[in-house]
């Protein structure tokens, strides 16, 4: 397991000097704490062969710098004045471990302004481990002979301020009886002289390596190049996106125009329905009621196909004379009642009598010609002139007698 803990150490001399100086003032005071932070890892091995590592951070407060006036380095809203801080902490900025506030007759609670100021100081010093020491003196007797001084050290952790254990070192503590030693490096003069001779080739004046600066410069140049390339890529992506949108728009326009052209062609090719030959349809349905084949197509007056479906519509044509039917009773064979249904035929009486009369006269003329072997030409002419019919009508009558009589229309 691995854990962390933080504690602070303050010498009795520093705490006494701090209390004596600020108790002699008439108002609240504040300032900065100087020192160093040490880290120590403690490894404890248990019987279960598991290592228990604990990292202990110790904040050693060694000095303090007072500010004899409030709001000397910040304003009422807690914003830091960098110029004032630069004057106060001219050479000891790296040694700042925290700041303190000497507040009379108040509780050990940080105010909202102090929280904001502490957050701004953390950003200014780039130190998230900055601590805050709050000192609150108070008088406990009416004669002002006895004073009480309470102190607490606060450190922010996950957005909340927690108290850090503060140990005041004095001669009465058993663990502080021995002398305090500070380990220092022992450097020879020859080593120092050699380092100073060649340090200019490898180190800068502040002690940093030159190669590190060169690497940092190269890194910065690479970052600039990367930014420029990213900008170009972004511009190209935007251009491609724009082109894709234009292509999609043109495709939609092409599809729209193509659809309009197809629709126009369809409207152009669509013709009006031709007029149906209703007389032909009615005649087929009248004379051939059981023939579905003859009912399966509909023809127009111009002999054009209208539709493939059968015509089941009754046109209500009761006048059969309009169909120009020429039917003889003797020519149509009689159908048995069981095989075919009776068909009612309508004939015009005056037209039938006329054709019967003409046929009888034609037969008489043929008999006279067969009896006489030789006939006078004058008699032939007289017979021809006496008959009002023409040769064309006679030929029609002959044909009417020779061919089979079937209903025509």
UniProtKB/Swiss-Prot annotation:
Q: Where is this motif: pSXXF motif?
A: 406-409
Give all Phosphoserine modified positions: 48, 386-387, 404, 406
Bias category Polar residues: which stretches?
A: 373-388
Top-level lineage group: Eukaryota
Q: Which GO terms describe its molecular function?
A: microtubule binding; polyubiquitin modification-dependent protein binding
Which Pfam families does the entry link to?
A: MPN_2A_DUB_like
* Entry comment on modification after translation: Phosphorylation of Ser-406 of the pSXXF motif by ATM or ATR constitutes a specific recognition motif for the BRCT domain of BRCA1. Ionizing radiation promotes rapid phosphorylation at Ser-404 and Ser-406 by ATM; this promotes recruitment of BRCA1 to sites of DNA damage.
One GO biological-process annotation of the entry reads: regulation of DNA repair
Q: Where is this region: Disordered?
A: 362-409
Every copy of the MPN domain together lies at 7-160
Question: Which InterPro entries does the annotation name?
Answer: BRISC_Abraxas1, FAM175, MPN
**Coiled coil, from the record:** 206-260
> What result follows from mutating residue 403 to A?
No effect on formation of a heterotetramer with BRCA1
Q: Name one GO cellular component term.
A: nuclear body
Q: Please note every region of biased composition (Basic and acidic residues).
A: 362-372
Give the keywords, sorted: Chromatin regulator, Coiled coil, Disease variant, DNA damage, DNA repair, Nucleus, Phosphoprotein
| Family, per entry | Belongs to the FAM175 family. Abraxas subfamily.
Q: Tell me how this protein assembles.
A: Component of the ARISC complex, at least composed of UIMC1/RAP80, ABRAXAS1, BRCC3/BRCC36, BABAM2 and BABAM1/NBA1. Component of the BRCA1-A complex, at least composed of BRCA1, BARD1, UIMC1/RAP80, ABRAXAS1, BRCC3/BRCC36, BABAM2 and BABAM1/NBA1. In the complex, interacts directly with UIMC1/RAP80, BRCC3/BRCC36 and BABAM2. Interacts directly (when phosphorylated at Ser-406) with BRCA1. Homodimer. The homodimer interacts directly (when phosphorylated at Ser-404 and Ser-406) with two BRCA1 chains, giving rise to a heterotetramer. Binds polyubiquitin.
What is the purpose of this protein? Involved in DNA damage response and double-strand break (DSB) repair. Component of the BRCA1-A complex, acting as a central scaffold protein that assembles the various components of the complex and mediates the recruitment of BRCA1. The BRCA1-A complex specifically recognizes 'Lys-63'-linked ubiquitinated histones H2A and H2AX at DNA lesion sites, leading to target the BRCA1-BARD1 heterodimer to sites of DNA damage at DSBs. This complex also possesses deubiquitinase activity that specifically removes 'Lys-63'-linked ubiquitin on histones H2A and H2AX.
Q: What name has this protein been given in UniProt?
A: BRCA1-A complex subunit Abraxas 1
* Organism in which the protein naturally occurs: Homo sapiens (Human)
